[in-house]
């Protein structure tokens, strides 16, 4: 079970916590936080790909068990502060509309020998560097899964 994915990818998702907050900070100079005390587990896209590769390559070792793949359980406010430390942006706290909060324990996967290499801080840095190379990142509904599903009339 993967955590909330973050980081730069060929199809950049801007509806995921770290990516969205970094995008808003960079382009809008505001980080919009609903509540902030909710916890989200995170995984960099490169680590997710490595974990899938690792699980497939060592499939006999895992015997069809379920493994969590997420390594940084952070409050939304912690993520916002990490971003604010890198971008001059104001944190705007709104009433908490999304009260979901969850953690992941990936110790079983770590005990098997898998080691993540990328952090939320790394994801923030690479997103900032990517946005710096673009005068205005031209996002479309393809960058937001729910909007894309509506566009394709998928329920």
Label for each model-derived stretch:
Residues 21:
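Anionic-ligand binding region
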Residues 13-16, 25, 61:
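A generic fold-level signal
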